[in-house]
């Protein structure tokens, strides 16, 4: 048999002809020799005709079955055709990175008469011979079953420290650094070591390690559980939400655009539709544009669907984690899969509904080969599978809004908030303010909000302490030697950092241009705003959320947990605090230096 093969990880736009003796299906993975090396290939199609040329044979089959359905194959062809994407790169999307979990073949008897338990195929052949196995298979007394060698991903572990005893500490002789650590731990039960280093701004872990070795501190290793955070579900839909749900369930259309302003309850409508399909044994694919949106969403889904298997899938996970979730999704063990655009390609066994939240977001566009639009691919996948797809946004894409007028997509609208009213927006003129960063009125509102037990979000569009360092004498701005852009001053690290390439350098003592000592840090970022607010409100707990303090999804989820538990009153952050977060005690949002945002591209 001749087959057309797409070469894995190849930028080439062609498929290649190989021959194989074993039965094979489109979508299966095989090993082939291509350009002098053995590599993975994907069976794209089967052929009967043989050309007048020598054809290579396939080395071996990799999986013994195709993981891809007809819908997956048609979706791959759509992406190849629509975005001129290389076939091998497109098929790579459907599989997790790295070598897929190994598959063991087992010989399983149909009855107990043969008197042996399920046995690995290789061991069976070694003990009884291959001819005997063929005889049993031909007489249908045994069958071959596949079992995946599942690696158990390591659970995250954190190390927390606490005082061995809180009495008698004062009498001990402590160095200044040790005293800082002890004073802090006198006010709390325990603290994670990495967090303790950050909060106390320690240059190294040495003071903590020394206190542990002296027996003053106790250390405890705790295994973390990803599923602790649960947000209780909303009991009942509002009248307008029920109307939208009814339209979805009664419509002949399969594609919907749910246009609803922030806070109108689009998520509750999603959950109601999800409930319908889950009760019918179907799987749900829930797409979000960024990893940062998954922690709180997962907590809400767990609260709405207790007992359901809810997983997340994104590029920040380890290879083993992604492979395990991929495999469980393929086998139909996952009820709800939440993830970024990469989760669109997981070949789920029984998908019944696709939800694309924040469908307008540019993060759904793949910016590297193979290029594609994740939202358009999701719509096409739903059409191929004849299942509903719901696109949700407060600011829908223009082209999708146009499709609602032509009838290809049904438009649904939510205009009323189920709880509360839309916020009052005040614009404060900073011309006459003494403080160039935060107005007197804003400070008074923060004080009032915090005193009432509520929380405040402060959005700053740049991280760091100061945007640039300039020489007053000659006007020279300190720039990155690699990028020629101004370097940002970070006060906590006492360094200049380039936010483009990551280059770091110490602050020069004199101007590199004229030799003057009149260097000054100008502008501000999250670090400066946090510093100023802490001066105004010394007893208020302030958290900063930017790429300096939150550098991975685990840290982000921990920060959200701190906010939900009200362990901080004021949260200062960059755009990571502006997307999809919903905390009932946040009563005030402050946008610092809003003028600068007006000239930014959207």
Which functions belong to the PLM regions below?
Residues 1-393, 405-419:
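Accessory, non-ATPase domains that flank or precede helicase/AAA+ motor cores in DNA-metabolism machines
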Residues 233-242, 254-602:
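Inter-lobe coupling/hinge segments of SF2-like helicase ATPases
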